[in-house]
A protein has these predicted regions:
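Short, low-complexity disordered leader/linker segments with a strong preference
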Residues: 1-55, 361-362
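Functionally engaged cysteine thiol sites
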Residues: 1, 148, 229
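Signature of the catalytic double-stranded beta-helix
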Residues: 146-158
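N-terminal secretory/targeting leader peptides
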Residues: 20-21, 50-143, 158-362
Length: 362
């Protein structure tokens, strides 16, 4: 064999060994990378597992066709939209999940994840919050909703610690409706008036005779003469067709209203990711505005129907309003005394509400 031929063979053999070594190194590092990805896969579950859809239910006693139910359905869809489908809330209207008087307890026990109802359905359970239902001279549901949420932020009543309060809203102011004109206290004496909760105290203080019954029974009671009037907002004039069975309304300056809550089961709330909690709270702030304005729209529509049916709206004179306010003042004083006996800041709560209305109500 020629010398140069031997050298070529040795060089080729050496090159082959080097290539083999390179392949081994590449295979080694590929194996290392594969093991690393495998370990990362164990440490971090797949994205789809992390993004499992959170399903919640919402109990609401309003009928499905009621516009309150419609707006709450929009709330559900807005939450789903802003969370990119990570949260889906199904609404159960008409009290099908929990009756209105049991909604709060139903939420605390997990029967419902979220619930909407009135505080007045469970008188005595929310003593410090009941200040919102007192005859403070409300002029709109919107101002009531704004006050209710500011009040909650300031006082954080312990009676609501069992749940996550999403937001509060209120009905429009409650007026007096009767089958005959009521222009003064004398006209009201002895009249049987459908009323419940705070409204019963109002009717009694003004000299009427309160008769407890749900609003759904008011039409028959009025048409049959069981009662001669009701106390409530204008909205039922349309919603419950009460404009057909009353002839006059009396608008007085110390009107009260009913506050209602939208709350969530505390454990369900705490289990939500922080970013989802933030999104829901942002939507809630917007819905305070929407719900407050909606209640007033419904009240306006109810009054229009009332007038169209021949109803007459009586606005009390300044002097007569003062007489009514004087009759209703003991309700406020009794509330403060009752709260004091329970060790609650009723006086401070009442002052806050009164000052808020003086400052922001036009």
């Amino acid at each position: 064999m020629l010398p140069h031929a031997g050298l070529k063979m040795k060089a080729a053999s050496l090159e082959q060994k080097n290539h083999g070594g390179d392949r081994m190194k590449r295979m080694f590092w590929l194996l290392v990378v594969a093991v690393m990805f495998s370990l990362l896969g164990l440490a971090c579950p797949p994205i789809y597992a992390q993004e499992k859809v959170i399903t919640l239910n919402l109990s609401n006693f309003f009928p499905p066709e009621n516009r309150i139910s419609v707006v709450m359905d929009q709330w559900c869809k807005e939450v789903e939209k802003r969370t990119n489908g990570r949260v889906k809330v199904t609404q159960f209207p008409g009290g099908t999940l929990t009756p209105p008087a049991q909604t709060y307890v139903g939420v605390t026990k997990g029967v419902a994840d979220l619930g909407l109802s009135f505080f007045s359905y469970t008188i005595g359970r929310f003593p410090l919050t009941e200040v919102l239902d007192l005859p403070l001279g409300y002029k709109s549901g919107y101002i009531g909703a704004k006050l209710a949420n500011e009040y909650y932020k300031k006082f954080r009543p312990k009676e609501l610690d069992e749940v996550k309060v999403l937001f509060l809203t209120t009905s429009p102011p409650h007026m007096l409706f009767a089958k005959r004109p009521v222009k003064n206290l004398e006209d009201l004496q002895g009249l049987k008036i459908r009323s419940t909760g705070t409204s019963s105290k109002v009717v009694q203080a003004l000299g009427g005779a309160p008769v407890a019954m749900p609003m759904s029974d008011a039409y028959d009671a009025l048409s049959k003469g069981v009662v001669q009037g009701i106390i409530g907002p204008y909205e039922p004039m349309k919603g419950f067709k009460l404009a057909e069975v009353v002839s006059d309304s009396t608008e007085y300056g110390t009107a009260y209203l009913n506050a209602n809550y939208i709350v969530m089961n505390k454990k369900k709330w705490d289990a939500l990711p922080a970013d989802i909690q933030k999104i829901i709270e942002q939507v809630d702030e917007e819905w305070i505005e929407k719900m407050g304005k909606l209640w007033d729209e419904l009240d306006k529509e109810g009054k229009e129907v009332f007038i169209q049916k021949g109803g007459k709206a009586i606005v009390l004179s300044k002097e007569e309003n003062a007489r009514w306010a004087e009759r209703l003042r003991p309700i406020l004083d009794d509330y403060v005394k009752d709260m004091k006996s329970k060790g609650l800041p009723g006086d401070e709560a009442l002052k806050f509400c009164v000052n808020y209305l003086k400052t922001y109500q036009k």
